Amino acid sequence: MDNVVDRHVFYISDGTAITAEVLGHAVMSQFPVTISSITLPFVENESRARAVKDQIDAIYQQTGVRPLVFYSIVLPEIRAIILQSEGFCQDIVQALVAPLQQEMKLDPTPIAHRTHGLNPGNLNKYDARIAAIDYTLAHDDGISLRNLDQAQVILLGVSRCGKTPTSLYLAMQFGIRAANYPFIADDMDNLTLPTSLKPLQHKLFGLTIDPERLAAIREERRENSRYASLRQCRMEVAEVEALYRKNQIPCLNSTNYSVEEIATKILDIMGLNRRMY
């Protein structure tokens, strides 16, 4: 049976709409409803704003239910058009700005694209994030062992346990230089910590995963293979976890966590500074 959509939700911004999406999604996750999400970035002129209003109104006319609208828009004339729609509109930034304005006794100076745009004040941070992404891509899955000492964290684990997506998320979201190193089936007969990693043990972090989940993931990649067999997965996970214990490497079972949660736990456990972009 198909899921019935309870509410249509719009995330609207005159910038990237990332802030509207993140905060709006966080709010909607509190309710047991099925939603249909529509993200509309760069609503920067009246013509586009009117088209967005028409889209909101059309859904209301089709469903008889007011769409929920989370928006972050600087220009008052654009906001006014969106507020004329049949949606239930929430200014996610102003809801926080108003009490802060009163507390700090300062007037805000809103500028479009300030949060996620490039400006002279954040170019160094942006360059650092791009450098972190480049580094992480160059050191994915053990591709290169050069300059490993420049990594802020080195993720270890068996194939398909979440090393690559976690590394990339750390780089893209937090500007962390994250390398990762795989343990493959051929390593299992005499699994030891590679010589190149021993001097960097303080940077090592191990990922593990339930064998049943690992087998299901691998089955999608190589169906009916030894690589994907539950027996093989159990053996590899057991060997890797024993290595972590022997070398006192902090580790995390990734089975029931999202990439965002895994990355955040790694930052916390390893004491790495979060950088928001």
UniProtKB/Swiss-Prot annotation:
EC code(s) of this entry: 2.7.11.33, 2.7.4.28
Record Pfam families: Kinase-PPPase
Alphabetical UniProt keywords: Kinase, Nucleotide-binding, Serine/threonine-protein kinase, Transferase
Stored InterPro entries: Kinase-pyrophosphorylase, PSRP
Positions of disulphide bridges: none
Listed GO MF terms: ADP binding; ATP binding; phosphotransferase activity, phosphate group as acceptor; protein serine/threonine kinase activity
Catalytic activity: [pyruvate, water dikinase] + ADP = [pyruvate, water dikinase]-phosphate + AMP + H(+); [pyruvate, water dikinase]-phosphate + phosphate + H(+) = [pyruvate, water dikinase] + diphosphate
Binding site for ADP: 157-164
Known function: Bifunctional serine/threonine kinase and phosphorylase involved in the regulation of the phosphoenolpyruvate synthase (PEPS) by catalyzing its phosphorylation/dephosphorylation.
NCBIfam families hit by this protein: PRK05339.1
Family the UniProt entry places it in: Belongs to the pyruvate, phosphate/water dikinase regulatory protein family. PSRP subfamily.
Protein name (database record): Phosphoenolpyruvate synthase regulatory protein
Gene source species: Salmonella typhimurium (strain LT2 / SGSC1412 / ATCC 700720)
